[in-house]
Amino acid sequence: MSTISDIKLEDYWISPRLGFLSDQPVLTELPNPYYRCWEQMISSVLPTDGWVLIRRQIDQMPLLSTKKLHTEPEWRRAYTLLTTLAQVYIWGEANPSDKLPRSVAVPLREVSEHLRISPCASFASFCLWNVAPVPGVVPTDPDAYDPDNLHIINSFTGTKDEEWFFVISASIEATGGRIIARMLEAVEAVHHDRIHVVNEFLNELASCIAEICHLLERMYEKCNPSVFCHRLRRFFSGSKAKEDAGLPRGVFYEGTDGGGDWLQYCGGSNAQSSLIQLFDIILGVKQSGPGIRRACTSFHQEMRQYMPGPHRDFLAQMEKLSNVRSYVLSHPRHSNLHNSYDQAVAALALLRQKHMIVASRLPHPLAIMASTISG
């Protein structure tokens, strides 16, 4: 069995500086001209046109091989492009399409298999791999991932509201990501009974979550709920449980030989963020009530299928190794360690409350579940 000292963050596509965001620069376009038609399809059809011609144009696209993708940033860029094309094809016109043509469906399934992620839009395609510092900002600058220093590469609507929604999410990822290495140190410290290290970590975690709460409160600075609901939200939609939208069987992903598969997937959602689930894991947080607990566990496990495979692996590994809560409970109830732990759990509960307030104004069917958490 692996120990905490065996974990190398880079093996899980995790940056000590940015967490689940990549240290490798996000590509703004694929370097091989072979894939130019994918890039041109995104850039030539303006969001202000309402995507009215997008299906006809995608239907005419050639089927490209994925064998010319080499680096991980290239695979991620391809995934972002193809999921964007899939969303505008399915949801860009008045009536959703229950078919995804082979020119998108085949390479999307191949790219997703490589990345070990579901072949559909996700938090990774909208946020992790579609947000970067604005030109002129040095990526290693401590303030590079302040929301005002970020921009999105591809957009569904071309609005500042959409961009702000995603850059806030990316800034939250970067803020929380900086504490992941400290989590590993705290888990290791438990084995050596270094109580001061665990206590310091819990205090840092509470401060980190408080900073994330502040970022979440900034959502309304430049994201108008009306724009979000009426122009952007449909592009987050999935193909699962969409009978009312005219997709009773989901979406048919065409294959290379004239066949294909009916597939159903959830839409893109911040519930697919590995960071928030990691906070639960490190604190040993459970949702209160057996029925709620089972529902939340099932929901969280389902959301992991929309995370990059290495991120999902990291969460599974941390579930096996996390020992902070049991260590805290082995100490007196009124100790400083207990107080620090309680403050971290309270900070996480407050974050969920603030998120639910945001979700109520920017409603989406896959918003993070409201729940009472118990440490």
Swiss-Prot record:
Heme binds at residue 311. Binds 1 heme group per subunit. It holds the Pfam family IDO. Its EC number is 1.13.11.52. Keywords: Dioxygenase, Heme, Iron, Metal-binding, Oxidoreductase. GO terms for biological process: 'de novo' NAD biosynthetic process from L-tryptophan; L-tryptophan catabolic process to kynurenine. GO terms for cellular component: cytoplasm. It catalyses: D-tryptophan + O2 = N-formyl-D-kynurenine; L-tryptophan + O2 = N-formyl-L-kynurenine. GO terms for molecular function: heme binding; indoleamine 2,3-dioxygenase activity; metal ion binding. Signal peptide: none annotated. Pathway: Secondary metabolite biosynthesis. InterPro entries: Indolamine_dOase (IPR000898), Trp/Indoleamine_2_3_dOase-like (IPR037217). Its cofactor is heme. It comes from the Eukaryota. Indoleamine 2,3-dioxygenase; part of the gene cluster that mediates the biosynthesis of terreazepine,. The first step of terreazepine biosynthesis is catalyzed by the indoleamine 2,3-dioxygenase tpzB which produces N-formyl-kynurenine through the catabolism of tryptophan. The two-module NRPS tpzA then utilizes anthranilate and kynurenine to assemble terreazepine. The first adenylation domain of tpzA (A1) loads anthranilate onto the T1 domain, while A2 loads kynurenine, generated through spontaneous nonenzymatic deformylation of the tzpB-supplied N-formyl-kynurenine. Belongs to the indoleamine 2,3-dioxygenase family. This is Indoleamine 2,3-dioxygenase tpzB.
